[in-house]
Each structure stands twice: as C-alpha cells, then as structure tokens.
C-alpha cells in the first residue's frame, strides 16, 4: 500500500485492527500525520463553536460537491489531533511481517503551498516546526525507514504537491518519477 495523508492512518488501522495484515506486504505512508497535528488541537480549543461550525459547513459543502455523500469536517480534524493520534497509536501497533516506511516533504515558505496550506503553514510551523503546510516532519516519521524529500532551490514541496494536486512543475521534483522510484524501490526490496 502507498497511502497519502490520512490514508496512511486508515491503512495502519486496516492492517492491524481489521485483519488485513496477511494481505499486505508493505505500507508506505506519504505525508501522514502519525503523531497528529498539535495545531489542530489548539485551534479546536480556541475557535468558538459557532465559528468552527461555520468553517465546517463551508468545507462540508465543498466536499459534497466533490462527491462525498456524508462529509464531516469537524470529525476528520478532531481525528487528526495529537491526542487522538496518540490514542490510535496505542491500539494500532505495527503488524509483524509488514514493512512500514514513511515519506515526508516540507515547504520553505507559506506561499509555496496553495490555499489553505499557505494559511496553515505558519501555524503548523509555530506549533510543530518544519512542515508541508499541514503535517509536521516529526509527526510523519514512522516505520523502519524514513525519507525526507529535500526540495531544491527556494521552492518547497507541499502536502498537495506530493500527489500532484496543483498540477505544477516544481524544479527538482517530478511527482511522477517520485512514485515510479518508490514502486521500484519496493520491488527491489521484494515487495
């Protein structure tokens, strides 16, 4: 499995708690917040309930337009807090026989991420340090192997860039070649 963001958390849960370990050789988690987002916890505590709901309604409406039949933005954000991830990690140990690795990128500046990552980057940096606009590097470390994608030049590699969300050419980073290399490395390792 190669999973991005929350997909890495869901994949770990499926492998360990849903009996999928016999069917999975490896999990590569790309920009996954294994240890959660401290900034999410802080914002959920500080933003008044009415404002939180208004933000959630806006995101939920957008997600419905994209095809999600029952979006729940607040539940998703709450699920990504540091405390929620700590609880999840306690009941989701790595499965024996499954190779776990993680990959992370980072932005050099807020403007290197598209909205809303350009807005969240400085907040994440304040609470969690080096980040991709959403996930901190330290939160993404998981498994036997950790790879940090080092952006060349002044441009960083955002949370959306690693899945080509913005369809941009980034000097020194070819997203297609990244995944081809990732798959080739897994093949070399026997997965």
Predicted regions and their residues:
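Serine-dependent carboxylesterase/thioesterase catalytic core
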Residues: 1-85, 132
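C-terminal catalytic-base region of ester-bond hydrolases, centering on the histidine
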Residues: 90-191
